[in-house]
Structure formats: C-alpha cells, structure tokens
C-alpha cells in the first residue's frame, strides 16, 4: 500500500468510529492530524482517548508500545479511558481496553439495567 492509500484507509476507520459514537449520542470528531499534531488522540470525544490502527494483514496483534503510549497520554485526573481500535484487511474491527476499565463499564451498565427492570 502507498502512503496515500494507508492514509485513506486510516481515515475510513476513524470516520467509522466517529459515526458509531455520534449514533449513540456521543459528541465525537476526528482530531486534526490524527493525533500527531499536538492532539492526544485520533478521535475527540468526552469518554475515551481513541487510537485507531489499520492493518493490511488478516491477523492483528496489539502493539504494546502503542498501548503504553496511549495510556501515558491520558491527562492526570482525567475520566477519559484509553481505547485502542484495530481493523484488519477484511475490515473486521476490534476495540481493546484495559480489563479493569471494561469491568467498571460493565458494572455501570448492569446497575443501570437492573434499575430499569
């Protein structure tokens, strides 16, 4: 893939994630420069610091250095959670987060669900 096609491939994933967040009522937009020009993340929103990565392979792996960098970019005392979004060449897409953050979200969801039943 050329650099231009890689850039377009990345923009497509970022657009997809922004669209999904907006559909849920979350104010979200793509960051200028996709997180590399003074922006913390690829996508601006109030809940997550999102890093999007496209892979030109079928199998994907979580790059520990990218994950550590993403976690280190969370501002002190911020409630925003790091979220690493990966997509393979077949457009299968995964969201990776810290397991403790996942269980915190799940607990809140279940408490809300039980309160409405």
Residue ranges of predicted features:
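Catalytic phosphate/metal-binding cores of nucleic-acid and nucleotide-processing enzymes, i.e., regions
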Residues: 1-117
